Amino acid sequence: GGDLYLESLAGHNLRRLTHSEAAEEAPHFSPDGRRIAFVRGFDLYVLDLASGAETRLTTDGQENVALNGTNDWVYGEEIWNRQPEGFWWSPDSSRIAFYHFDETPVGVYTLLDDTPLYPKVTSQKYPKSGEPNPLVKVGVVDVAGGKTAWLGTGEPDSYLARVDWTPKGDAVAVQRLSRDQKHLDLLRCGANDGTCSPLLSETWHTWINLGQDFRFLPDGRFLWGSERDGWRRLYLYGADGRGGQPVTPEGWAVTALDGVAADGSWAVVTAFPTAGLGAVDRKVARVSLKSAGWEILTPEPGSHSAAAISPQTGAWVHTWSDADTPARSEVRPDGGKLIALPSAAPTFDAASLPKWEILTIPGPDGSRLPARLLKPAGFDPSHRYPVIIYHYGGPGSQVVDNAWSVRSLWHKLMAQRGFAVFSVDNQSSLFFGKHGEDKDYRRFGTVNLAGQLAGVDYLKSLPWVDASRLGLWGWSGGGSNTLYCVLNRPGVWKAAIAGAPVTDWRLYDSIWTERYLDRPENNADGYRDSSPITYTANLKDHLLVVHGLADDNVHPQNSINLSGDLIKAGVPFEQAFYPGQKHGFRGPSSRHFYERATEFFERELAP
């Protein structure tokens, strides 16, 4: 198992804390540093560091049946950004609030590992769109053990999406999101009796995007992120839920609440200006919670983020990159000397790789769409070049940014091999705010297709582009949209790669899919028309479909079913399945995929 060890920062004094066959997961120190809580065998435990004594706080944990203190798959993926832990210490370290999941209603997806002599079967509880979700509740238990107080959150088929203790530790704040994701309540629940009452509520006609930008101040007031005016801003509420005054300025959208001062006088956020191409960058800003003052701490172009902010001193770790420079980090003491941290950036500065250009192009209905262009190395305007187009295309997504990515490095490799590389974000992307995202409600594909066709029109206007040699590719939702594009506009792109695509939206998980498409029984036409598998007989272009056989997010069932339909239609295509690989490839499989993608585009587009 994975036992826990404790090492003193003052010296090499490694101490083993647990001796168990089962692994300890999601360990977290109590606020006073005297205990560690963790999950073992789907139950919640507390270990006293002074005595070494363990206390088991729950007893009914069982795989695929009951989970305590840990997220089930769909909550971890869609609500908590793949965070495993599902428990929260009280401020005084005396109690723990935790999730309890009843997974018995949830259907099972079976993943098969064919690599051993006898294949290994893994059963995954995975609620597909329209199917039963896990039943979740929040309990509060004393660290000494004893009876759990269950919070009366009501509405069992809703999502209990965020859990936070009040500063005094006498209550727990729970964000309850309706299953259709149109209504969000912030509940205040007594930690002793479990009685809940609403502090505030929000409603939106399509769906509400959950944020991680709720934070209590020491005096009980709280910060709350909302897109009520079409862009995400922070609002300051009284402890009773009244008020709700904006503290971040109009014309800026907040993407993260990074930290709050110990005395509640300021907050640090990551944000971008909403006008024009402002969203390509990310700025770190400090907002005064006394005067609503707004100070940009990172005015330079690029993608900036803040981490490890000291609530006492205001010191923080600043990380920065741009489209052509890998991330650099530095410690920024409040008023002190900058401390640079190690970076790989100087190596790439000397590599003379092709540089990205960020621009706008004409879009549907007179709009301007954000785009990125990478010209081939040794660019000659009298030559005609093939173009690889990379996209994602989902609601609120963003590909066109001024930030480094590993995938961008492969695009630069392709530019060195004679390709131009291009991306365009459509009218439902992050650049157009919540009202833009809403264009995808109950129907995927059409908005992105219009954006990609606008991109093709722009490329055709460039005299050095050979529009007969256009390639399209994407991963996950981008793989789905790649299929949708080539199947609905055959002949526009000569070759395409669809990586880990959803091919039938009935096969994807409940939280993500229902947010945008509603339930299948309420929107059968939308599911049919949004699913690439509906159009398989239309395939005319060269297609490579790629999927990991251990993908527990977008199941290989999607690509297997697509392959079957393409075979029935008598349509030629290529496919590559990767044993043991999940939704993102690692190790030799990642290298193999990029080598395969390079070979595919060079063969089909012949620079």
Question: What do these predicted ranges mean?
Answer:
Residues 1-316, 321-325, 331-332, 353, ...:
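Beta-propeller folds
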Residues 108, 169, 175, 298, ...:
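Serine-hydrolase catalytic core recognition
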